UniProtKB/Swiss-Prot annotation:
The gene is lysS. GO terms for biological process: lysyl-tRNA aminoacylation. It comes from Salmonella arizonae (strain ATCC BAA-731 / CDC346-86 / RSK2980). The keyword Magnesium applies. Keywords: Aminoacyl-tRNA synthetase, ATP-binding, Cytoplasm, Ligase, Magnesium, Metal-binding, Nucleotide-binding, Protein biosynthesis. This is Lysine--tRNA ligase. The keyword Protein biosynthesis applies. Mg(2+) 1 binds at E415, E422.
Amino acid sequence: MSEQNAQGADEVVDLNNEMKARREKLAALREQGIPFPNDFRRDRTSDQLHAEFDAKEAEELEALNIEVSVAGRMMTRRIMGKASFVTLQDVGGRIQLYVARDDLPEGVYNEQFKKWDLGDILGAKGKLFKTKTGELSIHCSELRLLTKALRPLPDKFHGLQDQEARYRQRYLDLISNDESRNTFKTRSKILAGIRQFMVARGFMEVETPMMQVIPGGASARPFITHHNALDLDMYLRIAPELYLKRLVVGGFERVFEINRNFRNEGISVRHNPEFTMMELYMAYADYKDLIELTESLFRTLAQDVLGNTQVPYGDEVFDFGKPFEKLTMREAIKKYRPETDMADLDNFDSAKAIAESIGIHVEKSWGLGRIVTEIFDEVAEAHLIQPTFITEYPAEVSPLARRNDVNPEITDRFEFFIGGREIGNGFSELNDAEDQAQRFQDQVNAKAAGDDEAMFYDEDYVTALEHGLPPTAGLGIGIDRMVMLFTNSHTIRDVILFPAMRPVK
């Protein structure tokens, strides 16, 4: 047996012995009749206590004579004879308990408290005071075991080091990792901030189907499921777009939705098959209005959630305080590949030659617009570090966007980039029913030619457009990627509580 395997076997034996001892303690509690009591009530959380009393001097706290009730998980314990110090962790953070034998009912300290284990959930009552080192603490007069933990916590010095285990057992990650807890608290604040921002501007939050007969609103491979009662194959939605625009046809002129999308694609540091998007639609607006709204949204969130428009990310600092850069797709190609002759981007053969020269395999189904977009992705996207809007996307790769009035080969569309990755996509919506029908047909032809991500033909959506969609602009923002930026996280798994994982065999 190798040294590594031997160590692993020893760890399993240690865990089994630890769990056996803990189960024996639980059995003793069961004999006493109340192994999992549910009659303890706390009146404060640790962060509330620190916010209210950290600034007070020891003498002032003693004079106030404040009694509090707290509950949480025992993370550390230092037993020093007749007295002990405990670190209790709750949703707000940590608070120290001072536990003295003579201040508790007879037998509690030696017969109960000293036999409890790290990870157990406790309830404590007592008076606030400060130690000689100035740490806010609770001098316990009552201490109860509320939940017996049968498994030990991760090593207190090293935490949960295995990345796979962090994602598979997120509960352990959250117990032992302050950074993870703060990431998901920030995510919650971002979502609340988005909702507040949108409602303040007259948008109504709505919900649209997660299972669809025809998946639409994006170019992606869908997940397929089966509805037994209807005996019908259905698709998990890849985007809510077409349903949201139906609502605009119906008269809801400003709508937004924050919800899950599902795309049957690869998993990477940027991609999870199940992800969260915010989409909005705004009648009587164009893509330029949404550029302004997007800039305002990110600036507002940075200030309100993080308290600063300068947001650190790795070695970079994103500046949301100054005006965001704006480039057309072709300007970006020229900027990051200066040798490009702009005239070559207007010619299929010349553009194809450029694409192949930089390692792009050009599919037979691609037209000029797709080739130019692929060139942009290859030469420019990774360089768009500071907040940047890219405009003038080809109509070929924008089947739902409105054609530009001056040049019908491009659309009134933008994508928003930060840190070298796309964060948002918006455009003036196509509201010409006949043009939309033709573009759907073009997508059907592309699918027949082998493009698995091409869109389906949605006849009912065309029917909705035939009733009249007002001039409208729409925007989609990837919430997971947004959270990555605001929390300095470099893999999407760090900002999704339960990311997709291959099952353990």
